[in-house]
């Protein structure tokens, strides 16, 4: 898969599912998040437990909390160094395409996630949020690593 900057097309609607290993010692698993390109306007939407989050206990949905492609910290107790991120999969299109519909849903309805106040290691977690969004669009198939523990929490 190409890198994010190589795939980015500011004339299209694109939804990227990004990943990064989670902090050591759990870095076998990966953390997923959405990067939305709405014809040149880029947003990062994710769910998780983050230090510095404005939510109670650090658990919640975040929009643009971190730069679009910034990976997770390598250790729980330090902000740096960070793992790199990668594109797990993406979809693109023009107005009224599945990419447009998915991008619009993530931007407008991410706060409707039913478990936005719950976080557990095996789920619900960041990957469960991505799985919940994708479940709303059964016509869209994304290839995501089996290391995304919690992705199928809603199935």
Annotate each predicted stretch with a short phrase.
Residues 1-122, 154-155:
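Non-catalytic ligand/cofactor/substrate-binding and regulatory segments of enzyme domains
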Residues 29-31, 117-138, 142-150:
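Active-site nucleophilic cysteine motif
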């Amino acid at each position: 898969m190409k890198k994010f900057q190589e795939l980015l097309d500011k004339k299209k609607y694109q939804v990227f599912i990004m990943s990064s290993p989670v902090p050591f010692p759990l870095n076998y698993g990966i953390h997923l998040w959405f990067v939305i390109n709405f014809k040149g306007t880029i947003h990062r939407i994710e769910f998780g437990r983050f230090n510095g989050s404005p939510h109670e206990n650090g658990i919640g949905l975040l929009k643009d909390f971190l730069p679009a492609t910034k990976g997770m910290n390598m250790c729980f107790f330090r902000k740096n160094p960070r793992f790199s991120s990668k594109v797990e999969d993406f979809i693109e299109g023009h107005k009224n395409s599945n990419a447009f519909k998915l991008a619009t849903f993530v931007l407008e309805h991410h706060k409707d996630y039913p478990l936005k106040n719950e976080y557990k290691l095996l789920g619900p977690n960041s990957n469960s949020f991505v799985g919940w969004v994708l479940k709303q669009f059964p016509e869209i198939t994304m290839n995501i690593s089996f290391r995304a523990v919690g992705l199928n929490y809603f199935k």
